[in-house]
Amino acid sequence: MKNIPQNVKESIQKFTIEIQKLLGERVKKVILYGSYARGDYNSDSDIDIMILTDLADNEIDYYRRKISELAYDIDFENNFDIMLSPVIKNIEKFNYWLNALPFYMNVQKEGV
């Protein structure tokens, strides 16, 4: 995460900690992808984060709103100068579809 502004790094770290508190060991991996991972971000870029878990689909649906609320709280703390854009997926399905879905391939390729 070099060359990323300090406030963005701190927000990503805070978000990751809050996700760990919420989901515990169910979190298998947190991936930063997109423009911040590639280093070609600008002032309008959002912060793309994928959360891979071992949760079932119905559990993911339950937690999706809570995760969005966590992201919103951090965005609010930063006066919306940054925008976290979290996505939560089941790790087994991610790995299964990794070589078939371009979105997953990009996350894997760019992700840090």
Predicted stretch roles:
Residues M1-K29, R38-S43, D54-V112:
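Catalytic core of pol beta-like nucleotidyltransferases
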Residues D48-L52:
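Short beta-strand->loop micro-motif that forms the acidic, two-metal-ion catalytic signature
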